[in-house]
Swiss-Prot record:
Feature type site, description Interaction with substrate tRNA: T104, R126
Known EC number: 2.5.1.75
Molecular functions (GO terms): ATP binding; tRNA dimethylallyltransferase activity
HAMAP family, alphabetized: IPP_trans
Keywords: ATP-binding, Magnesium, Nucleotide-binding, Transferase, tRNA processing
Gene name as annotated: miaA
GO BP annotations, alphabetical order: tRNA modification
Native source species: Vibrio atlanticus (strain LGP32)
Subunit structure: Monomer.
Binding, ATP: G13, P14, T15, A16, S17, G18, K19, T20
Name used for this protein in its record: tRNA dimethylallyltransferase
Known role: Catalyzes the transfer of a dimethylallyl group onto the adenine at position 37 in tRNAs that read codons beginning with uridine, leading to the formation of N6-(dimethylallyl)adenosine (i(6)A).
Length: 310
């Protein structure tokens, strides 16, 4: 008889949809342990602008995979998959259920489907590409990518240096294009996954929550948090940490490119766009149960039933 795979729960959703509150309430009721699935919460010293759970919330419900990196460091979907599976196995060994909570859809996809066998980052080649970008401009590098990998060039915008650099780096390391390599899937996830997504039914309610959240961030000292990061000589706006929504716009403000009101406006707009992308991902997601942000009791009951019926 085949041994039953361990249960894991995914709680996905757009930014500001109430995922964290729901996860904390579920943990108070059931033996679940929370793993964060968020490419911004991984960074230390980035608490306010990421809406990281506060000390009180973390005391009630510790989150794994937050505050694990300095903002100067990069973290890939492959890094996340390795770390998340390690934490999931530890949680199961403790006799508990992994509850993965967040909105970084690429991380969930990597976890479920595995990853293509892409080469590890090569700092020397990255520096070489960065030097070329300064000398020739990103458009010239995009033209280069179009010649070797037109499919990736169609997908990657010339103003997206992070992805453009990675596509060129992969080719220079391996001699194969990103398109070739991503057609090969990795290992699937050795868990039985029940997947849920939470969001308000009305888009205007999500927009209201996003605006309110940004206002609260400013009141809580987001500008001072940003100034501390801006003062560091090892940080710059091309880093994944500073490219996070909100941080990118506040960096522009500190650079003198706009005033604070404009930075807040841009930050809210960028957050709305992020939420729209997250919802687009989720609408095409298979085997997903939707929960209503405005009916937390019902959402909690649905999650409770999923655990109790297993």
């Amino acid at each position: 008889m085949t041994e039953k795979l361990p249960l894991a729960l995914f709680l996905m959703g757009p930014t500001a949809s109430g995922k964290t509150d729901l996860a904390i309430r579920l943990r108070q009721k059931y033996p679940v342990e929370i793993i964060s699935v968020d490419s911004a919460l991984i960074y230390k010293d980035m608490d306010i602008g990421t809406a990281k759970p506060d000390a009180g919330e973390l005391a009630l419900a510790p989150h794994r995979l937050i505050d694990i990196l300095d903002p100067s460091e990069a973290y890939s979907a492959a890094d996340f998959r390795r770390d998340a599976i390690s934490e999931m196995n530890k949680i199961v060994a403790e006799g508990k259920i992994p509850l993965l909570v967040g909105g970084t859809m690429l991380y969930y996809k990597a976890l479920l489907e595995g990853l293509s066998p892409l080469p590890a980052a090569d700092q020397e080649i990255r520096k070489q590409i960065e030097a070329e970008s300064i000398e020739q401009g990103w458009q010239a590098l995009h033209d280069q990518l179009r010649e070797i990998d037109p499919v990736s060039a169609e997908r990657i915008h010339p103003n997206d240096p992070q992805r453009l650099s990675r596509a060129l780096e992969v080719y220079r390391i391996s001699g194969k294009t990103l398109t070739e390599l991503t057609q090969t899937k990795g290992d699937s996830l050795p868990f039985r996954v029940k997947q849920f997504a939470i969001a308000p039914k009305e888009r205007k309610e999500l927009h209201r929550r996003i605006e309110l959240r940004f206002e609260k961030m400013i009141e809580a000292g987001f500008e001072d948090e940003m100034k501390a990061l801006y003062a560091r000589e090892d940080l710059h706006p091309e880093l994944p940490s500073i490219r996070c929504v909100g941080y990118r716009q506040m960096w522009d403000y500190l650079d003198g490119n706009c005033d604070l009101d404009e930075a807040v406006f841009r930050g809210v707009c960028a957050t709305r766009q992020l939420a729209k992308r997250q919802i687009t991902w989720l609408r095409s997601w298979d085997d997903l149960t939707w929960l209503d942000s405005e009916n937390i009791e019902q959402a909690l009951e649905t999650l409770s039933d999923a655990i109790a019926s297993d």
